[in-house]
C-alpha cells in the first residue's frame, strides 16, 4: 500500500513537472525564411512612419484576432499606405504569439535591409508588409 502511494505521488509530481515545462516554453523565434523587395525605404520617408505604426498594430492585435490579422495604415499628405498581415501558429499561447511578433518586428528591418516590402517567417510567426494591398 505504501509503495502504491509513493508511485502515485511520483507519477503526479512527474505530470506536474511536465505540465510546467509545456506551459513555460517560450515562442520559437528561430528564423525560417524571408523574401525581401529589392527597393529600399528612403531615409526619412513618411512611409516609414506608417509602416512602423502598422507593424505595432500587427504585434498588438494578431494574438487576439484569431492568430491571423490584416491591417493597413494610411499616411497623411499623400504618404503611401502601409499594408500588413501577421499570423501565428495556432498551437502557441496568445502571449507567445505576441512575443514572437515583437521579436520579428524588432528584426524585420535588419533581415530585409529596410526593404519597401517583406515576408519573413519565424518558426512560430510570420509578417508580411507591402506598399500595396494584397
UniProtKB/Swiss-Prot annotation:
Residues 29-134 form the Gnk2-homologous domain. It comes from Ginkgo biloba (Ginkgo). This is Antifungal protein ginkbilobin-2. Alpha-D-mannopyranose binds at residues 37, 119, 130. Residues 1-26 form the signal peptide. It comes from the Eukaryota. GO terms for cellular component: extracellular space. Keywords: Actin-binding, Antibiotic, Antimicrobial, Apoptosis, Disulfide bond, Fungicide, Lectin, Mannose-binding, Plant defense, Secreted, Signal. Possesses antifungal activity against F.oxysporum, T.reesei and C.albicans. Weakly inhibits the aspartic acid protease pepsin activity. Exerts antifungal activity against S.cerevisiae and F.culmorum through its carbohydrate-binding specificity. Acts as a lectin that stricly recognizes alpha-1,2-linked mannose moieties and interacts with the yeast cell wall mannan polysaccharide. Can interfere with the fungal actin remodeling resulting to the activation of an actin-dependent cell death. The keyword Disulfide bond applies. CDD domains: Gnk2-like. GO terms for biological process: defense response to bacterium; defense response to fungus; induction of programmed cell death; killing of cells of another organism. It holds the Pfam family Stress-antifung. Disulfide bonds join 36-112, 88-97, 100-125. The gene is GNK2. GO terms for molecular function: actin binding; aspartic-type endopeptidase inhibitor activity; D-mannose binding.
Amino acid at each position: 500500500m505504501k509503495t502504491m502511494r509513493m508511485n502515485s505521488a511520483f507519477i503526479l509530481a512527474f505530470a506536474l513537472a511536465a505540465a510546467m515545462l509545456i506551459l513555460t516554453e517560450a515562442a520559437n523565434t528561430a528564423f525560417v525564411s524571408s523574401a525581401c523587395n529589392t527597393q529600399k525605404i528612403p531615409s526619412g520617408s513618411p512611409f516609414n512612419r506608417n509602416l512602423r505604426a502598422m507593424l505595432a498594430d500587427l504585434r498588438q492585435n494578431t494574438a487576439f484576432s484569431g492568430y491571423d490579422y490584416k491591417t493597413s495604415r494610411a499616411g497623411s499628405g499623400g504618404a503611401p499606405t502601409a499594408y500588413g498581415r501577421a499570423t501565428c501558429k495556432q498551437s502557441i499561447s496568445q502571449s507567445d504569439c505576441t512575443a514572437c511578433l515583437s521579436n520579428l518586428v524588432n528584426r524585420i528591418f535588419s533581415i530585409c535591409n529596410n526593404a519597401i516590402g517583406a515576408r519573413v517567417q519565424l518558426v512560430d510567426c510570420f509578417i508580411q508588409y507591402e506598399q500595396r494591398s494584397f
